[in-house]
Amino acid sequence: MSETAKKVIVGMSGGVDSSVSAWLLQQQGYQVEGLFMKNWEEDDGEEYCTAAADLADAQAVCDKLGIELHTVNFAAEYWDNVFELFLAEYKAGRTPNPDILCNKEIKFKAFLEFAAEDLGADYIATGHYVRRADVDGKSRLLRGLDSNKDQSYFLYTLSHEQIAQSLFPVGELEKPQVRKIAEDLGLVTAKKKDSTGICFIGERKFREFLGRYLPAQPGKIITVDGDEIGEHQGLMYHTLGQRKGLGIGGTKDGTEEPWYVVDKDVENNILIVAQGHEHPRLMSVGLIAQQLHWVDREPFTGTMRCTVKTRYRQTDIPCTVKALDADRIEVIFDEPVAAVTPGQSAVFYNGEVCLGGGIIEQRLPLPV
């Protein structure tokens, strides 16, 4: 290893993607060290066990690769900058995306600063399925090579400066290749399943978890025609387009179509439902977004044609974007879209390049 080798701190989660990222960076000649982040203190037994197992797996991988593993506690930052906002959004009847917030405030802010200032890193690296490319002197965020795993939707808040300081080794690979590398290396994480659930809080029963922090208020479920057909256990447990968990499966309105959530009346604590996943009340012709983040950090004015995702794993939607003011845009879809959800993120693309995005403030309903 040359003395001039750049130092990279890899965010080690105890999963297969970060494990293979560390090895790939070693192969590329970087001086590699790992960092395990603890971001949640409200430990119940089950969560404590999961975090302990993840740390043990991260340590086992680092031992196998012959690299040092640091640990850091960002629980206070997570609570203040991610979790409290997450709760406030749910309380207001919106559906936030904690993974996006967590990337913005923890992985590419607290971690990036800690790695540079405390550990002397030249770069950080994560196991995200995205790529970076330099265009006109600025780093761009590109979709991951594996379209099934692309995670650019969750990283749209990053600036070109943050991307320039970050490496994404598995973004150039497909998931089966990553697992095969881990198996060939004999890493304990090779067959570990991908984590789901709230960022850093792990997999747990969501209703039960949310109910600890926000008291649920039961209320009426009514149809779009105003008929009361059931009771919900709390508006915060429901999101637009939701079909399961409504408890009204046996009630039919002269048709066999299932019921879907089409709106939430937060003021009166009423859940509004309709039958059919393409009911006009569920469709939107566009949206208004705010809290904008453009990767190039250039202010957006005028209009542009691009594509948008209003949720993860959605097929790109062709659209026209128009600036309303410095921090608000209007987005008009080429075709109506179902279940556009306030609180979620709208993320914009020009081909492979992620341009940035914003929070959906309101949807523009299909005129009925």
Curated annotation (Swiss-Prot):
Its EC number is 2.8.1.13. It catalyses: S-sulfanyl-L-cysteinyl-[protein] + uridine(34) in tRNA + AH2 + ATP = 2-thiouridine(34) in tRNA + L-cysteinyl-[protein] + A + AMP + diphosphate + H(+). It is found in: Cytoplasm. GO terms for molecular function: ATP binding; tRNA binding; tRNA-uridine 2-sulfurtransferase activity. CDD domains: MnmA_TRMU-like. Keywords: ATP-binding, Cytoplasm, Disulfide bond, Nucleotide-binding, RNA-binding, Transferase, tRNA processing, tRNA-binding. Residues 149-151, 311-312 are annotated as: Interaction with tRNA. ATP binds at G11, M12, S13, G14, G15, V16, D17, S18, M37, G127. The active site is at C102, C199. One of its GO terms (cellular component) is cytoplasm. Its main location: cytoplasm. It comes from the Bacteria. It is an enzyme of class 2 (transferase). Pfam families: tRNA_Me_trans, tRNA_Me_trans_C, tRNA_Me_trans_M. Disulfide bonds join C102-C199. The record marks H128, Q344 as: Interaction with tRNA. GO terms for biological process: tRNA wobble position uridine thiolation. Residues 97-99 are annotated as: Interaction with target base in tRNA. Interacts with TusE. Catalyzes the 2-thiolation of uridine at the wobble position (U34) of tRNA(Lys), tRNA(Glu) and tRNA(Gln), leading to the formation of s(2)U34, the first step of tRNA-mnm(5)s(2)U34 synthesis. Sulfur is provided by IscS, via a sulfur-relay system. Binds ATP and its substrate tRNAs. Belongs to the MnmA/TRMU family. NCBIfam families: PRK00143.1, trmU. This is tRNA-specific 2-thiouridylase MnmA. It comes from Escherichia coli O1:K1 / APEC. The gene is mnmA.
